[in-house]
């Protein structure tokens, strides 16, 4: 890993642990939101990849040190997460940290659970400039996509039984109806196709194509 563990201050004044992979002052920022496994090496690796692409990247530890590779435990951790607190405190605090440390524009990107939190962040965090969501959508009562006022890019899998194609259709319909600035892409892949630790779901061709699209999108909207 090329970054380091840090702490940043949340809006409520308390602190949150995070992994920071910084490029240099003045570069645009990206907050990378974990999957339901926790802040593991795979998510830190994505932050490193974003740093190599020219961004200052930070991944907040939403589970406060807890990490697992077992689905049952991951589901338990996700079910116990305070989603409003994660959005309004941890993720917003990470956005503010990047902005106060030289990134004039900041995006949030996330996978699975983090994808749902990306949409929630796009709705609720006023300092945010763009969002990139991978195969995750929050309940509409928590974060209505019709309220999004920043550019949003979405990446979804056609063979996904967690964030289903029908759910992606519903998201697109909401974004289209409110005139949102959005891009939505679909891949002939499984849920989690960007997780290179998953022998079953990882699809390098789809993942690399999504990353290319992400870079173009962020370069445009964070310039």
Name each model-derived stretch.
Residues 1-223:
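N-terminal cap/leader regions of alpha/beta-hydrolase-fold enzymes
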């Amino acid at each position: 890993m090329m970054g380091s563990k840090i702490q940043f201050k949340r809006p409520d004044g308390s602190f949150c642990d995070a992994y920071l992979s910084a490029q240099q002052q003045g570069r645009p920022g990206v907050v990378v939101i974990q999957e339901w496994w926790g802040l593991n090496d795979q998510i830190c690796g994505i932050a490193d990849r974003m740093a190599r692409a020219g961004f200052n990247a930070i991944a907040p530890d939403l589970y406060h040190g807890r990490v697992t590779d077992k689905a049952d435990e991951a589901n338990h951790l996700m079910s116990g997460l305070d989603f409003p607190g994660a959005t309004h405190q941890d993720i917003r605090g990470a956005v503010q940290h990047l902005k106060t440390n030289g990134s004039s524009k900041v995006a949030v990107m996330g996978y699975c659970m983090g994808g749902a939190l990306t949409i929630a962040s796009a709705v609720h965090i006023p300092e945010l400039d763009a969002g990139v969501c991978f195969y995750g959508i929050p309940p509409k009562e928590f974060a209505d996509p019709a309220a999004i006022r920043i550019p949003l890019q979405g990446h979804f899998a056609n063979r996904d039984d967690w964030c289903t194609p029908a759910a992606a259709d519903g998201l697109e319909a909401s974004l289209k109806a409110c005139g949102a600035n959005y891009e939505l892409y679909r891949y002939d892949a499984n849920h989690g196709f960007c997780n290179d630790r998953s022998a079953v779901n990882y699809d390098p061709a789809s993942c690399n194509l999504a990353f290319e699209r992400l870079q173009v999108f962020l370069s445009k909207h964070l310039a």
